[in-house]
Amino acid sequence: MKYLAGYPAPLLEQVRQLLAEDKLGALLGKRYPDGVHDIQTDRALYGYVTELKSEFMRKAEPLSKVMFDNKLHVIRNALGTHTTVSRVQGGKLKAKREIRVASLFKGVPLAWLRMIVVHELAHMKEREHDKAFYALCMHMEPDYQQLEFDLRLYLTHLDMNGRRLWDASSRP
């Protein structure tokens, strides 16, 4: 249960029991009955991210690229990345910011996509995963901690069973 490292032992025991009884998937399915969101393209993701950014981080630098990345989870063991590329243009240094979200998020509920987008947007202001970072995440998404935990449960479910709970191809 690598995704749940650092959580208290009694909580981990509850998760082990849910896994043993094959009830973890059903629990998550009940919690997120709406299923998969309809943000399936890079263009739609860019629109969604810039909408959240303009709502909560108007003064932050603009994003030059936002995209789903097929290789992200496998290569970097990450679900999202934020990068800043600096280039010399004329006599000035110009920075381009981009956010990449693992393609896994095409097939999950909107709440989890929002959680990872909020996480990556928070990195535009706070580099480290510290108290200020999580306070910013909680400001943008009040249920951030629960959503992150539920996503970790889902990743554990995928790791143990290999079965997705929602199918992106059957969304409304």
Regions found by a protein language model. Give the residues of each.
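Histidine-centered acyl-transfer/condensation active-site motif
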Residues: V117
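Walker B catalytic acidic pair
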Residues: E120
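Active-site-proximal or metal-binding-adjacent scaffold patches in catalytic folds
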Residues: M1-R114, M124-P172
